[in-house]
A protein has these predicted regions:
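Small-residue-rich hydrophobic transmembrane alpha-helices
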Residues: 57-64
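Perimembrane loop-to-helix junctions flanking transmembrane segments
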Residues: 34-44
Length: 257
């Protein structure tokens, strides 16, 4: 009888628990530097890989989707709706995050972080509407990729996808190339995601070993706040979007199936 392989979420959960155990062991042994020198680098590599894959996935998936429409009128309509949807959902996420952060902070549930000696906390400055609008449009392709500016990446994808469509037969090679590259990047993304247990284990072991067991309570509170925010955001944005754009009732299981 073939053994059933553990699902990825189960592997991540086990890695989380093992990371806590290993981190506590090194903390009480008084050797947290071992996790810093030999475990944290692997966690950093995993985080770097996640950052690396985001832009190619968004860019190629959008170009592939736009090209598959085959109609520039649809591209224009979908393009501005995508940008508008991104801005609205991001704004809602920011508001939810600020509300939950203030509630938890005023209740004294969040840990207080101490600044390193000599470090200065710089207050964020708000940009006006026109600056935000200008910032959506890229001036340098590679700079948009380097900074992972998702709005600019979306605009680049819309422009390139529209260019491929309007090029007609001459754009066929580019279309085939995008489809092939997207298939490849999907495989790369699947591989990186499969490394999640390693990333979770190494980072959790390092955090617990260097911060001590008291960090577990703080992390639990922060994660709890984050997941509450995710749930509220999903209900407000994605459930409403499913009903508005696809006519799907998220509460009715039959309509989803």
């Amino acid at each position: 009888m073939e053994k059933k392989k553990l699902s990825l979420p189960a592997q991540i959960f086990i890695a989380l628990l093992l990371g806590i155990v290993v981190g506590l062991a090194f903390y009480f042994m008084g050797k947290p530097e071992i996790t810093t020198n030999y475990l944290k680098p692997f966690g950093t590599i995993f985080v770097n890989l996640l950052k690396f894959i985001v832009v190619p996935v968004v860019l190629l998936s959008m170009i592939d989707g736009i090209v598959s429409m085959g109609d520039m009128k649809k591209v224009g309509s979908v393009g501005w709706k995508t940008v508008a949807y991104f801005l609205v959902t991001t704004a809602i996420a920011c508001v939810i995050g600020l509300v939950f952060a203030n509630i938890f902070n005023n209740a004294g549930l969040f840990p207080t972080l101490q600044l390193v000696d000599g470090q200065v906390w710089e207050k964020a400055t708000s940009a006006n509407f026109m600056d935000t609008l200008i910032g959506i449009f890229p001036s340098n392709l590679w700079e948009s990729f380097r900074t992972s500016n998702m709005l600019q990446v979306i605009v680049i994808a819309i422009l390139l996808g529209g260019g491929i469509l309007t090029a007609g037969e001459k754009g066929k090679l580019a279309q085939d190339m995008v489809t092939s590259l997207y298939a490849v990047i999907e495989r790369v993304m699947a591989f990186i995601i499969s490394l999640s247990p390693i990333g979770v284990f190494t980072m959790m072991a390092w955090v617990v070993a260097t911060q001590g067991p008291e960090i577990l309570g703080s992390l639990g509170i922060v994660l709890g706040c984050a997941y509450l925010g995710y749930i509220v955001h999903a209900v407000l944005c994605y459930s409403v979007s499913a009903k508005a754009f696809a006519g799907i009732n998220p509460i009715d299981r039959k309509s989803v199936v």
